[in-house]
Amino acid sequence: MNKRAMLGAIGLAFGLMAWPFGASAKGKSMVWNEQWKTPSFVSGSLLGRCSQELVYRYLDQEKNTFQLGGQARERLSLIGNKLDELGHTVMRFEQAIAASLCMGAVLVAHVNDGELSSLSGTLIPNLDKRTLKTEAAISIQQAEMIAKQDVADRVTKERPAAEEGKPTRLVIYPDEETPRLAYEVNVRFLTPVPGNWIYMIDAADGKVLNKWNQMDEAKPGGAQPVAGTSTVGVGRGVLGDQKYINTTYSSYYGYYYLQDNTRGSGIFTYDGRNRTVLPGSLWADGDNQFFASYDAAAVDAHYYAGVVYDYYKNVHGRLSYDGSNAAIRSTVHYGRGYNNAFWNGSQMVYGDGDGQTFLPFSGGIDVVGHELTHAVTDYTAGLVYQNESGAINEAMSDIFGTLVEFYANRNPDWEIGEDIYTPGVAGDALRSMSDPAKYGDPDHYSKRYTGTQDNGGVHTNSGIINKAAYLLSQGGVHYGVSVTGIGRDKMGKIFYRALVYYLTPTSNFSQLRAACVQAAADLYGSTSQEVNSVKQAFNAVGVY
């Protein structure tokens, strides 16, 4: 089996370069979007006495730079406003015109001590000056039929059993140089193979402008929670190690369930019974001892979900993947010999593997951490799973999956999936953060994959960012560039802050660099070794 899931981008931000501010922000730092000729990352002391209105005022003041084509308050809608862990106010805005949101055009504003300190994200310039149609010529139903037919013809080769996905909506899609009115259609299905496809359908003529699979992969006698008493059971995982797990005893049913009531809104583990219907049945046992071989995948999925919850809570102050203590649900024994695991947008799903290429996927703690980090990304930056933004999405999951493994101190290393991949081959893994080239992945931007396979190389080009993260943590010399390591903890803090507070759906590698530099400055000071090490690490992999 090919180790990379064969999953192609919205090019809001292509090559970036440093650019000076206008007179009103003299001497500040800016990263420039070469495609749209507008800023994608701005930092420094911008304006004081900040509020939503101040952000609008600054953008209007810099109208020749941002080229919004109208008043900022008419083009940007506030969609989020919160305080972060450092006491900074973080506001998220979406660009819209004629009530249609602009796909991926999100702006994040940071306020520190009452002063606007940074803007990140890329906006589409001069929409009011373009011949942009704002009324659709085809209906929602027609757009949905076109997307479903394309799935049947080109993806599954048969009509899939579609599930309810995100509602179809009209958006402004930045199709190369000409933004277009388009329908965003979500086609979600589990058979014949799982998929969570996003389609951009031209609202004028029904043409498929773009499509990608947003399925984030690694490569009581029912589904409802039960009322009962919290207990602790014991069992054996996929690799034969014993674990204590939080369960719930229902006196009504007389069974112990894999339902952990001690963390957030609960952790629930289900038995898929080798079918493809989710979530399956809440796992039940008669004596609270889970030592049967069939139990092993469930023991690990349940236990490791708790470890991931604890990592994000204790290290980053994050309560579950959504930040609001959402329940974590996992299904094991999905399908027969299914060689993958995925986050489907609402829960975790683990295949059993075929016993040769893979063991049950829940047996790898870094795999569980990887997949649940996709959920964190969904609720924060929302990185589009295609091209560079998709590779960042994958790299974030590799980074935090690895950090979870170190946090739990379960034979930690810088390999991905080594515990469950090719059980008959020692020393093998899906990917390596320390040496991406070991498994054929690029370790420098000059070696990046530029084709369309794997959604534009999301599982391949992630190696570039993985190497940067490894160098930032451990240090070393790479392509002649010396990097001073700052340790895993600080590296994780920097990448987490970049993910949650600076990245936007279409961020590319250069924007990630700028976000990590700013995150390090926020945490450790603008003249700190940490900031210098971030720059060194990205220099070493050719990302500027």
Curated annotation (Swiss-Prot):
Reactions this protein catalyses: Similar, but not identical, to that of thermolysin
Residue ranges of the propeptide: 26-225
Binding locations of Ca(2+) 3: 405, 411, 413, 418
Keywords from the UniProt entry: Calcium, Hydrolase, Metal-binding, Metalloprotease, Protease, Secreted, Signal, Zinc, Zymogen
CDD domains the UniProt entry points to: M4_TLP
InterPro entries named among the record's database cross-references: PepSY, Peptidase_M4, Peptidase_M4/M1_CTD_sf, Peptidase_M4_C_domain, Peptidase_M4_domain, Zinc_Metalloprotease_M4
Record-linked Gene3D superfamilies: 3.10.170.10, 3.10.450.40, 3.10.450.490, Neutral Protease Domain 2
Record's signal peptide: 1-25
Binding-site list for Ca(2+) 2: 366, 405, 413, 415, 418
GO-annotated biological processes: proteolysis
Amino acids binding Ca(2+) 1: 285, 287, 289
Classification via Pfam families: PepSY, Peptidase_M4, Peptidase_M4_C
Annotated active site: 371, 459 (proton donor)
Residues where Zn(2+) binds: 370, 374, 394
Free-text remark on how the cofactor is bound: Binds 4 Ca(2+) ions per subunit. Binds 1 zinc ion per subunit.
Cofactor: Ca(2+); Zn(2+)
GO MF term list: metal ion binding; metalloendopeptidase activity
Localization (cell): Secreted
Residues the record lists as binding Ca(2+) 4: 421-422, 425, 428
Activity under varying temperature: Thermostable.
Name assigned to this protein: Bacillolysin
Organism: Bacillus caldolyticus
Gene responsible for this protein: npr
